[in-house]
Structures are given as C-alpha cells and as structure tokens.
C-alpha cells in the first residue's frame, strides 16, 4: 500500500523517491478540472450541447447524459482478462451501440466511461491541442505538478508500482489513463479545491452532487453522490468528502479531501489486491486522524 496526506495545504509524507501508480478513474477528476477551465475561459458553457450531441457538458461530467458504458459488455471483460489489445474507439461504440442513448439526458444517472471519452474529445477540439498537452497546460502545470502523464502503452504501465496491471493495455481506458506518484494525486485534489485555478462559482458547481441513494454496504458513504467529475457525499460524523475512487486490474486508488472549519486534509491511497471499500476506509481513517491532530 502507498499513501500520501496533505494537511492544511502541506504535504505530510516525507520526501522520497516515489513509484508511479495508475490513477484509474481519478483521471476523471483531472479531466473535469481541464473541462471546467474551458468554461472559465468562455470556450463553452456548462449547459451547452457537446459535439453536436443532445447532451450538455454538465450532463457528461455528472454521468447524466444517457450514455451506456463498455463495462456492461461481457466481451470487454473477457478481452481485458485475456490481455488483448484495446478495440479502436469506433469499434467499441459499435459493439456497445453507444450512439443509442439509454435515457433522455438529464432524467437519470448511469456511470459512463464513454461520457468522459466525449469530454476528452471536446477538450482536444476546443483547445486544438492533444489531450496530453491540454491537461498539462490547463490543469497539471498550473497546480504545480510535473511528474504526471498519460500511459499510452503496456510498457508505460510496466514502470508503475502496479505490477499486476503490467500486461494491461491502457488504451482500454478510452478517456485516457494518468499515471503519477500518489503524493501528486493528493496535491492535485487539494490544490484544485483550495486555489484559484477555478473560480468559486465553478468549484461550487463541481461539488454540487446528484444524490445516489443511501448507505452502500462495505463503503464509508452514508449519502453517496456525484458532482462534476467528483464523488461527493457524507460519512459518519457529519463530514463531507470530495474526490474520486478508481479501480483497474489488480489495484485501487482513492483520493479524497475533507474540510472542518478552517482545517482541511486530503488523503490519497493506492493498494493492490484490495477492494474499493477497504481503500476508502483507509483514506477516511487518515483524514479523521489528521483533523483530530489539528484539533
């Protein structure tokens, strides 16, 4: 297990040579921040239709666009298990019948990696940059992060701590898969939510969540929800967490931030062979300990 803690903006873990780890779906939070920077700069509005589609950027970011997800396909799971190369994106959409919306945008909720693939394409179109360069210029670099990049090949993942995913083709993550040190994930989220990369209004929009039912067995959530690229919800003690959990072959990452008055803490944990709930529980324990120590 690897972990990193930021308390009141200061990295608590000692300086060390850190391994790279896959950020899995925490990448969505980075993509959301990049997309919201486009809103900040007037290149698009949250409620504008995206790429000539019937859904808006807000609906994509919050998984309300009506899109399906390739995780529903048995042949997808079989191909990943067999270490097969990723299908081209157009083949994935054809196999999924991805152009057929599953519900009218804005009327339901369905977690969709395909939605974030649309967001990645939108970022490239509106910036006239590659996704790599757009994310670096608009999100990573402004927040002081430099050792984070997209994994493009199996060889890229072989450089990470997650040995069990070394034969996994990162192109299966159609919206892109970031890799970086665990401390950089904690710093990214903490700085995103407490600096002026995005204006207060956009940060409020980002953290305005759609409530998704009640407590989840084996997870810390009492009222889980999803905002614009962030998992947002309450836990025991009346605290509200904001961040994201991600999982891939053999490993899980969870990155969350909590505030209590003027105090804040942000924890990132990566573990191989663990469940999402187990890793989230470690994050919650670290956050609560950090708040107690500040008290």
What are these regions (language model features)?
Residues 10-13, 37-55, 126-154, 199-204:
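Short, well-structured active-site flanking segments
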Residues 104-108, 121-126, 175-176, 217:
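Short helix-to-loop capping/linker segments positioned immediately adjacent to catalytic or ligand/cofactor-binding
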Residues 103, 152, 156-158, 282:
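A beta-strand edge to alpha-helix "cap/lid" segment located at domain peripheries
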Residues 24-43, 60, 96-97, 110-139, ...:
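Alpha-helical scaffold elements that line and support the substrate/ligand-binding pocket
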Residues 82-85, 154-175, 231-233:
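Carbohydrate-binding/catalytic loop surfaces
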Residues 62-72, 142-151, 211-218:
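Secretory-pathway/luminal and periplasmic proteins that interact with or process carbohydrate-rich
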């Amino acid at each position: 297990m690897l972990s990193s803690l930021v308390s009141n903006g200061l990295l608590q873990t000692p300086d060390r040579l850190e391994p790279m780890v896959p950020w899995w779906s925490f990448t969505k939070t980075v993509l959301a921040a990049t997309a919201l920077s486009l809103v900040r700069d007037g290149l698009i509005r949250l409620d504008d239709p995206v790429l000539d589609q019937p859904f808006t950027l807000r609906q994509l970011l919050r998984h309300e666009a009506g899109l399906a997800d390739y995780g529903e396909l048995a042949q997808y799971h079989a191909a990943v298990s067999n270490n097969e190369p990723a299908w081209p994106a157009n083949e994935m959409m054809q196999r999924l019948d991805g152009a057929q919306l599953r519900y009218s945008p804005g009327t339901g909720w369905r977690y969709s990696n395909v939605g974030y693939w649309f967001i990645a394409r939108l970022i490239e179109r509106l910036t006239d940059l590659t996704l790599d360069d757009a994310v670096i210029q608009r999100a990573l670099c402004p927040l002081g992060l430099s050792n984070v990049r997209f994994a493009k090949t199996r060889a890229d993942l072989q450089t990470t701590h997650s040995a069990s995913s070394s034969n996994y083709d990162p192109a299966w993550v159609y919206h892109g898969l970031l890799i970086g040190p665990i401390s950089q994930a904690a710093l990214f989220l903490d700085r995103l939510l407490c600096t002026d990369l995005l204006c207060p209004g956009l940060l409020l929009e980002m953290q305005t969540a759609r409530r998704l039912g009640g407590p989840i067995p084996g997870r810390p959530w009492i009222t889980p929800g999803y905002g614009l690229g962030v998992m947002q919800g309450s836990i025991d003690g009346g605290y509200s967490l904001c961040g994201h959990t991600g999982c891939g072959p053999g490993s899980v990452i969870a990155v969350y931030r909590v505030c209590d008055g003027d105090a804040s803490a942000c924890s990132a944990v990566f573990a191989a062979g663990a469940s999402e709930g187990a890793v989230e529980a470690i994050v919650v324990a670290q956050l609560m300990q950090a708040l107690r120590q500040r008290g």
